[in-house]
Amino acid sequence: MDTKQTDKQATFGADIRANLRMLKEALPAEDILVYEFTAGDGIACAAVYADGITDKELLGALVARPLAAAPAPKTREEVRRKLLFPEVKEADDLDAAGKEILAGNPALLVDGVRGALILGTKKVSLRAVAEPQTAIAIKGPREGFIEDIKTNMGLIRRRLKTPALRFIMLNVGKYSQTAVAIAYLDGVADKKAIRAIEARIRAADIDGVPDSSYIARFLARRPLSLFKQAGTTEKPDILCAKMLEGRIAVLADGSPIALTLPYMLTEDFQSAQDYFVSPYRATVSRILRLFAVCVSVFLPALYVAAQLFRLRLIPFGLLIIVSGGIRSIPLSPGLEMFFLLAVLEILVEASVRMPKYVALALSVIGALVLGDTAVKAGLVSSPAIIIVAIAGISAYTVPDLTGTLSLVRILYVVVAGSIGPYGIVLLTALLIWYLVSAESYGVPLLAPFAPLIRHDLADSLYKADLAALDRRPRALRGKNRTRLKLRRDAAAGREDEQPSGEGPDGQAADAAGEEKDA
């Protein structure tokens, strides 16, 4: 409802005709219908609802029939007691009732009774809870979020059965009035971060919120940053694990993607599978992901710089192969690499947006036919194609950073083709300076490495055993840092000293641990 065209202070009276006239003037859309019926003693009643998103059968069975069979009610409380529907709210003003009607919850008006009753008969067509295509799990839970915020909140509540789980409900969007939920664990998440996130969402001035990515734009401290500033996930088990560490979740109705804040860069090098395998295997996997990211970013630029400025850096045997491949290439190494990277991005974009059966054929054509034909025609060299292929594949070991890595990779190729190895070193220094100075709601983006937080290293690129994860990450600044107390020698009935300290909050161990970390 356009609040500029209606009077927010207009309130309902006891005359049903006057109330209906106000609603029709405020909601002139053709899909806003009125279901009129009579209660006991011939009292006129009406339910104003939005066609298509209101369950009309439920409206008739649980509202109209009980009122028709009962004596005429005189107050809203009497009307509420006669209804067979549990979800009933009161609305005194036109603005509140209009928003509920447009959300799918009809407003019930009874002649002689002041105000309206909002009935929770919203009809929503939902897809089933299923495994998200972007986060296929080999081991572990396979549930994923869907587009209904209430269902997503229920998936979180089912895993965190505690009164400490809190939800802050907001409506964002001038026209969409999208429901947005801020979820956190009271006593675990940082209060300052919660207030800052809530303030930014409340201050968002936007027409509509089709997806949670629109909310992420308002939560970003540096909107034009190359690197994302909020974590994302489609799986409730991953979200709950992050909330148990002290992070805050943001859900938006209509979006299966949840945002997590504060965000640290090391999150993207972690996988849900790391917690279902041994610490050694998880550590090796994380190091391999970091190595793959370095290969994806630096390999094309180093190839260009070595050809243009430092050809002697290439081993002699490899130099013979490379020189034979590039001898008749009309393009310079920098332009050749830039051209191949652009073709790679075009193929990726086309395969993502095409139907699956077309995308597979497109990938084969792009990888085999175009590559082989380009080499035979002498447009590009075979070593360059191999390097671009390795760089492209390596980027997908960290799917959430693929877009960022593509941009950074192109930047490195440009500076390598312009000023050689010195450009690579200079750009690397600038990126490190930028990442070190960036933060997400008081948490450094490169934590726990810059600044160095020893205890938090136990679950960064290195995955320690469960016993070493007795406290929550210090970087997240939560007050209650204790999350694990191991009881040893239980069979003998003896409990060893708990590493988390005494007391329910583990304050003694927290203080000792902070001194040790410092």
Residue map of PLM features:
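Membrane-embedded alpha-helical signal segments
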Residues: 1-302, 312, 316, 436-518
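Generic detector of multi-pass transmembrane helix bundles and their immediately adjacent loops
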Residues: 302, 315-501, 505, 516-518
